[in-house]
């Protein structure tokens, strides 16, 4: 199910950003210009991340899955960003604590049922250290999914 929402123009490998806002601004330019979302999606993501952080500390690596603002999604998508240098984001399980995120999956879905199904599959996928290692190496995302 995940493959059908992942597009080549939304895969960003070995990128450098100073922080989450810098990353979000860059990815949003692509999402808006390619008609995946309306510009308001950015504000919705920032707000949601403040209230309900999406950073997950797993076994030896950290991942974030920012999502939200379904009313601004024009075309359902999953965007993958691997980072040259980790960025600080707050933890999902302890919002007051930050962690260094290596990989980010930004997702946008117009329907909550699709959103929940894909989020569940993504959560299962990211718990496999081999998958994360392959993504960091730049292995084809579609072969990993």
Model-derived segments and spans:
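Cytosolic covalent-transfer regions centered on His/Cys nucleophiles
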Residues: 1-145
């Amino acid at each position: 199910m995940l493959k059908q929402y992942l597009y080549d123009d939304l895969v960003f490998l070995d990128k450098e950003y100073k922080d989450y806002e810098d990353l979000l601004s860059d990815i949003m330019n692509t999402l808006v210009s390619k008609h995946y979302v309306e510009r308001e999606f950015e504000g919705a993501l920032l707000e949601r991340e403040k209230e309900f952080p999406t950073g997950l500390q797993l076994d030896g690596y950290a991942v974030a899955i920012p999502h939200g603002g379904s009313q601004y999604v024009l075309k359902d998508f999953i965007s993958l960003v691997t980072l040259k240098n980790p960025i600080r984001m707050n933890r999902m399980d302890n919002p007051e604590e930050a962690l260094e995120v290596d990989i980010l999956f930004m997702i946008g879905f117009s329907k909550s049922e699709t959103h929940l199904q894909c989020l569940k599959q993504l959560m299962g996928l990211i718990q496999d250290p081999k998958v994360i290692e392959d993504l960091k190496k730049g292995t084809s995302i579609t072969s990993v999914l």
